[in-house]
Amino acid sequence: MFLTTANLAKAKSKTILVQMVSAAGTGYFFNTKRNRLRDKLVLRKHDPVVNKHVLFFEKKKIRSI
């Protein structure tokens, strides 16, 4: 009997941590979770630098959760 090691594919997580950046150009950002299968997030949230609600766009993936 021969023992072999099987290379199994690593399972991907369902959620990922992404960085959301203000569209006002203030440099303000925050991190949030989203489902891996969804499209990129766009949220309307308060930006404390300009003290207004602005759009936040997903800039980059930080890590898998």
UniProtKB/Swiss-Prot annotation:
Transit sequence range: 1-8
SUPFAM superfamilies found in the cross-reference section: Zn-binding ribosomal proteins
GO biological process: translation
GO molecular function ontology, one term from the record: structural constituent of ribosome
Gene3D superfamilies, per database record: Ribosomal protein L33
Coiled coil (residue ranges): none
PANTHER family: 39S RIBOSOMAL PROTEIN L33, MITOCHONDRIAL, LARGE RIBOSOMAL SUBUNIT PROTEIN BL33M
Assembly description: Component of the mitochondrial ribosome large subunit (39S) which comprises a 16S rRNA and about 50 distinct proteins.
Family of this protein: Belongs to the bacterial ribosomal protein bL33 family.
Protein name in UniProt: Large ribosomal subunit protein bL33m
Organism listed in the record: Tetraodon nigroviridis
